[in-house]
Amino acid sequence: MCSTREEITEAFASLATALSRVLGLTFDALTTPERLALLEHCETARRQLPSVEHTLINQIGEQSTEEELGGKLGLTLADRLRITRSEAKRRVAEAADLGQRRALTGEPLPPLLTATAKAQRHGLIGDGHVEVIRAFVHRLPSWVDLKTLEKAERDLAKQATQYRPDQLAKLAARIMDCLNPDGDYTDEDRARRRGLTLGKQDVDGMSRLSGYVTPELRATIEAVWAKLAAPGMCNPEQKAPCVNGAPSKEQARRDTRSCPQRNHDALNAELRSLLTSGNLGQHNGLPASIIVTTTLKDLEAAAGAGLTGGGTILPISDVIRLARHANHYLAIFDRGKALALYHTKRLASPAQRIMLYAKDSGCSAPGCDVPGYYCEVHHVTPYAQCRNTDVNDLTLGCGGHHPLAERGWTTRKNAHGDTEWLPPPHLDHGQPRVNTFHHPEKLLADDEGDP
């Protein structure tokens, strides 16, 4: 039976009204057992809401175009709900596993993880339980048949109603051992798990590198580390580090680094060598290289930090060290407008991209955190209208936002030289027009003060 628009509107209005009443209550008159019982009610409601979201997400994904959404589904959810892109991606993937589906003929289909979806819909399991079950299912070897998979999923969903997520994870591990006692995995299974993630920078600038590597990559890393991570090799603490040949006995003896530190320095040296070799060719019209933006004031004071085209905050000491072997460029701005670019090496059109790295730092669409390395150059005034490529009429746009300019969105420059993104009327819900993510200092500056 299909619900009417009026029924849906009334139900959500009633939900909001009921929640408002609950928010206005005080609980001083209750006993401890009664308070615990109410917390169970809250947990049940919290667990049930995703079931509603799954259906909505799947219907939007099936029935909407990118023009109607203003981009890809995950990006739209992240911006509209003000959640991270990774969280939006997780919700889309979870909806695909637990949400209601339809066949190509329009016939309703049960969720892929039927038992888990049912338990969630009744509020018997929460996000933690769902995460354990989904991870278990996606980790199963490809040779496990559908009947066995469905039975294992039913068993885990039943156990999830009685145990905490951490306890359920241990049960899932035991079931995995029973189904695959010999640890037989195919190349397809390993390929599905492969991946490396460079985490966000901590307050000290350090980042965590995590993930899973294939046996082939592991063997390659071992061979490289055996050479470059040996004691005395690639030691940044030495004035003339040994990067070729064999280190002297004295270099090896004076090397006080731990094995993990030597591994780190070896990887850094090898990647730096690859960058300087020129064998990587070009990326977005520029030679593959590290591009750092900083201010003349910070350079003269030897304090502060620079910002790379990938969004990394680089201490000024590292900037100066890298600059010893780099081509230098000086970009001059009047507020948001580019005046000139001076450089120590002759450039042609790539100069405009360097200027945009210095000015925009990343995608100029409001709220977007994609750094400059992964952006395309966008004509604020369509090229078909202006017929020229003026750096003050250019901006950076990521692969998700750049196409929006041809799907009803318009862009323009304001008086400060910043790019404004104007959505079509059906997508306009009062969101910001200018991106300040890459330039948080603008939020702290007075409107009439220094840029």
UniProtKB/Swiss-Prot annotation:
Region (Disordered): 415-435
Source organism superkingdom: Bacteria
GO cellular component: peptidoglycan-based cell wall
Pfam families: DUF222
CDD domains: HNHc
Family recorded in the similarity comment: Belongs to the Rv1128c/1148c/1588c/1702c/1945/3466 family.
Annotated protein name in UniProt: Uncharacterized protein Rv1128c
Organism this protein belongs to: Mycobacterium tuberculosis (strain ATCC 25618 / H37Rv)
